[in-house]
């Protein structure tokens, strides 16, 4: 049970680093975090995913700008659900190789000393360091823990959210794309399950839009806000709306 608890804590921290920091804060500027919290999220992303903030932000912004077109980096409508669900990480690598897009869409991402000298040029050093730490602390089970951590974002974010989130589920809004909400209680993927709501109001720090929807990422933001560690910049109005309103 101890290892399962560690796995749950580590993987959920990674999910929160992606949804709160990379997505809601860096890509869409819906929320700002205290520098200590922001840097912790950036460090944890480097340690557990090897993803570079600027690249992630650029690819996601391009997804919104070119949604459901041939230029969308990961639309199941153009690439096929199987391709996005099972090869999401490969599509991400292909997208980050488009350096002109990274320049165009990645503006405003961190570019401080540690980003230029560690997080960007040595992105793969994070997971390697994590493998060493896991092995020292937990032995052979630590290697299994590391393997699951490495697969967590490629499966749940690149596969489930980017794939199923544009293919299956319910819609509150008739947005100009095929985005869907996978479940009203968004507890497992940091709130990213409410993908149609997000596409309707991309810059909103809160993804839940109806009284019976729950966004665990928003709960985390509110807790950090209560501690003076987060500042909400944009939030969509909470409306109990009828389904399929056009936006």
Descriptions of predicted regions:
Residues 1-160, 164, 204-247:
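Non-catalytic, topology-defining segments of multipass membrane proteins
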Residues 106-114, 168-194, 198-201:
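Active-site-proximal inter-transmembrane loops
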